[in-house]
């Protein structure tokens, strides 16, 4: 009988944060909204708060960057470590160090599903269906996958069964699809700048933006709109039809996450050939099942917010059973290792984090070292051939550990 590899147990879990309301501003990292001034990601983008004039010009004005980056590190008995980042900041540190630690330490490094289920069950009474707690659980889950991969010496995508394609092709999210085309991306997704409180004038302005980019990018380059939960069904339907002449590929996250009936109605009334997408701010498998039943075309979970890689794999299987696509929201290497194994993810998202979208900057810069960026809009699977997620923690960042156990 052949010997079976003996796996170590987890000895320590630690949680740090950078950025957020109680630290330095513009820290970037896992909270990619936490950028400095003059950045496209904070420039008059439509949000649920845009109806209040005091908060319509800047997303940071209503506190989109108050959480900061959570960094979770798990250490095995053999002193190998795995880590991950998400958006949960100092509050996420408390949850990890004062609650979730009991489900992690002492477990085998391969006990990922057990730990995941225990974290979900133990936080159910205060987690709801997503948000800060789910972000924290996601971060722990990703750190566990990173550790497991490093212990066995395999990239995470091989732990999931291996790649189903040689490379990942990307569209770019940012204010300049025309620049994205020059960089080799297959499409460009722009934020909307106006909402229902702006009436038909807002629709005309955003449609004019799409028309301008269509002229600059030519007839075949994909163009999409990201509405970031800022609209109602009536406005979203009108906007979709106003943009249809310019071959808009999809309209994204028009409504708040809980408005499932609204998504069903929007899908029913959208122009023929235009896709309706959502999922970035949904958490838990159950919420994605309900979202899938609305008939939307693409589900877009964020692996750092939806419950981690363990949940993302379940969401992809759910979508596949219904003939739907899964195209995760950003998330860099944490998505790369998943989507290259999914048969229903033909492309992926790259979030432009350079201020004017003119250069390629790693999404979670500066917290990750060796974080890859697309070359000519693509990342080959060989780039992912490093143990775990293939990145290291930049300990030169101002890491703060406010709690311990």
Swiss-Prot record:
Site label Transition state stabilizer, positions:
349
Keywords attached to this entry? Lyase, Magnesium, Metal-binding
Q: What GO MF terms are annotated?
A: hydro-lyase activity; L-rhamnonate dehydratase activity; magnesium ion binding
Listed PROSITE patterns: MR_MLE_1
Q: Name one GO biological process term.
A: carbohydrate catabolic process
Provide the cofactor list for this protein. Mg(2+)
Recite the UniProt cofactor note for this protein. Answer: Binds 1 Mg(2+) ion per subunit.
Site (Increases basicity of active site His) found at: 302
Gene3D superfamilies in the cross-refs: Enolase-like C-terminal domain, Enolase-like, N-terminal domain
List residues binding substrate.
33, 59, 349
Using the record for this protein, list the coiled-coil segments as residue ranges, or answer none: none
- The protein's enzyme class: lyase
Keyword set includes Metal-binding: yes
Active site per the UniProt annotation: 329
Which family is this protein grouped under?
A: Belongs to the mandelate racemase/muconate lactonizing enzyme family. RhamD subfamily.
Its UniProt miscellaneous note says: Reaction proceeds via a syn dehydration.
The record's function comment reads:
Catalyzes the dehydration of L-rhamnonate to 2-keto-3-deoxy-L-rhamnonate (KDR). Can also dehydrate L-lyxonate and L-mannonate, although less efficiently, but not 2-keto-4-hydroxyheptane-1,7-dioate.
Subunit (UniProt): Homooctamer; tetramer of dimers.
UniProt-recorded name of the protein = L-rhamnonate dehydratase
- What would be the name of the gene that encodes this protein? rhmD
């Amino acid at each position: 009988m052949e010997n079976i590899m003996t796996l170590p147990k987890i000895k320590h879990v630690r949680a740090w944060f950078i950025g957020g309301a109680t630290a330095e501003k513009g820290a970037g990292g896992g909270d990619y909204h936490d950028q400095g001034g003059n950045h496209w990601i904070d420039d008059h983008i439509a949000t649920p708060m845009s109806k209040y004039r005091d908060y319509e010009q800047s997303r940071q004005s209503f506190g989109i960057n108050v959480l900061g980056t959570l960094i979770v590190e798990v250490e095995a008995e053999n002193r190998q470590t795995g880590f991950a980042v998400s958006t949960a900041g100092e509050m996420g540190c408390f949850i990890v160090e004062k609650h979730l630690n009991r489900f992690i330490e002492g477990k085998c490094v391969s006990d990922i599903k057990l730990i995941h289920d225990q974290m979900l069950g133990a936080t159910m009474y205060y987690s709801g269906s997503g948000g800060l707690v789910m972000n924290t659980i996601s971060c722990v889950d990703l750190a566990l996958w990173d550790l497991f991969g490093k212990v066995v010496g395999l990239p995470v995508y091989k732990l999931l069964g291996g790649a189903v394609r040689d490379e990942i092709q990307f569209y770019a999210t940012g204010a300049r699809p025309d620049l994205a085309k020059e960089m080799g991306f297959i499409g460009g997704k722009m934020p909307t700048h106006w909402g229902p409180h702006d009436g038909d004038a807002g629709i005309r302005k955003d449609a004019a933006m799409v028309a301008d980019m269509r002229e600059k990018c030519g007839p075949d380059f994909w163009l999409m709109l990201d509405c970031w939960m800022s609209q109602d069904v009536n406005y979203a339907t009108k906007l979709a039809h106003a943009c249809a002449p310019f071959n808009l590929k999809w309209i994204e996250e028009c409504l708040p996450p809980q408005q499932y009936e609204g998504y069903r109605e929007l899908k029913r009334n959208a122009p023929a050939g235009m896709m309706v997408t959502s999922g970035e701010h949904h958490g838990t498998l159950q919420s994605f099942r309900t979202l899938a039943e609305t008939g939307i075309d693409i589900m877009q979970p964020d692996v750092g917010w939806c419950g981690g890689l363990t949940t993302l794999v379940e969401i992809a299987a759910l979508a596949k059973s219904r003939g739907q696509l899964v195209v995760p929201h950003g998330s860099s290497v944490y998505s790369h290792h998943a989507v290259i194994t999914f048969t229903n993810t033909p492309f992926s998202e790259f979030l432009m984090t350079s201020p004017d979208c003119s250069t390629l900057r790693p999404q979670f810069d500066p917290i990750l070292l060796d974080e890859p960026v697309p070359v000519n809009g693509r990342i080959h699977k060989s780039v992912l051939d490093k143990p775990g997620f293939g990145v290291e923690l930049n300990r030169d960042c101002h890491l703060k550990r406010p709690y311990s156990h």
